[in-house]
Amino acid sequence: MKNDERTPLPDALAQPLERFYAYLHTEKGLSLYTQRNYKQQLETMTQYLVQVGLTHWTQLDSAWVRQLVMQGKRQGMKASSIATRLSSLRSFLDFLILRGELQANPAKGVSAPRKQRTLPKNLDVDEMAQLLEVTDDDPLSIRDRAIMELMYGAGLRLAELVSIDIKDVNLSEGEIRVIGKGNKERKVWFAGQAQEWVGKWLKLRSQLADSAETALFVSKLGTRISHRSVQKRMAEWGQKQAVASHISPHKLRHSFATHMLESSNNLRAVQELLGHENIATTQIYTHLDFQHLAQVYDQAHPRARKKNKDD
């Protein structure tokens, strides 16, 4: 149903919604985008509830809320979209409780359909070695190999990588300070090949970087490299190195996670390395099979092992 086809809501339903929108704006200070999203979700649900007989919010019980879930499934909505709807409804009903207009929140006992978790695609160790066997020695190629070694060697998100400044890197200790999701700071470790190639890049960085630029990785224009540039260059290297599957920054992070868990018995440690808030997010990489996991970072990561001086 399009917005302009919607029938006006009864005052008993519309007025509490308007008070909630004002609350989101004045007291919660949410962005306009988030406010619009709440409004769209709530008004879509309320239109449906009116059609099936709701006239006042005090009528709403868990059976009505389950109807909303079933309606979403009939419409072919993703489980995550239904969960977003339910979250919006819970927030609104909590507001009504806060105002003394409801006694309990009927949406709190209703769950969205379980989201089907698909296993992330990753490269195996041989494919990673093939991708990273970059022999070109120009500054851009060395930068690109340093980026790929670091993303795979530390399991970084793309946003984390491009936001790294020179001051965040302790090369000798193999440590980097990154800002992850939710603006949370964490320390990541890198060793072996990643440490070696970041060091090579740092020696050449001044050939490309503007004098005032603080970013670790810069573009050929001398400024901080963009997300899109990293994605494009990785895809190009995948083709050049004849790797069968499409290469993306996310795939390198997935490969880091999978390879670490295949060689390590420490799910919590890998959770910390990835910056996952919830361990369930990390568990997806285990294929629900923990029997073959063994031990942690320097011993586990195939490119973190230091070369023997006699090699």
From Swiss-Prot:
UniProt xrefs under InterPro entries: CB (IPR044068), DNA_brk_join_enz (IPR011010), Integrase-like_cat_sf (IPR013762), Integrase_catalytic (IPR002104), Integrase_recombinase_N (IPR010998), Integrase_SAM-like_N (IPR004107), Recomb_XerC (IPR011931), Tyrosine_recombinase_XerC/XerD (IPR023009)
Gene Ontology MF: a single term: DNA binding
Compartments reported by the entry: Cytoplasm
Domain of life, per lineage: Bacteria
A single GO cellular-component term on record: Holliday junction resolvase complex
Tagged with keyword Chloroplast: no
Principal location: cytoplasm
Active site residues of this protein: R157, K181, H250, R253, H276, Y285
Domain Tyr recombinase: 118-298
Record key words, sorted: Cell cycle, Cell division, Chromosome partition, Cytoplasm, DNA integration, DNA recombination, DNA-binding
Residue span(s) of domain Core-binding (CB): 11-97
Biological process per Gene Ontology, one example term: chromosome segregation
Xref: HAMAP family: Recomb_XerC_XerD
Described function: Site-specific tyrosine recombinase, which acts by catalyzing the cutting and rejoining of the recombining DNA molecules. The XerC-XerD complex is essential to convert dimers of the bacterial chromosome into monomers to permit their segregation at cell division. It also contributes to the segregational stability of plasmids.
Subunit composition and interactions: Forms a cyclic heterotetrameric complex composed of two molecules of XerC and two molecules of XerD.
Miscellaneous comment in the UniProt entry for this protein: During infection by the bacteriophage CTX-phi, it is required by the bacteriophage, which uses host XerC and XerD proteins to integrate the bacterial genome.
Stated family: Belongs to the 'phage' integrase family. XerC subfamily.
Protein known as: Tyrosine recombinase XerC
Gene source species: Vibrio cholerae serotype O1 (strain ATCC 39315 / El Tor Inaba N16961)
Gene name of the encoded protein: xerC
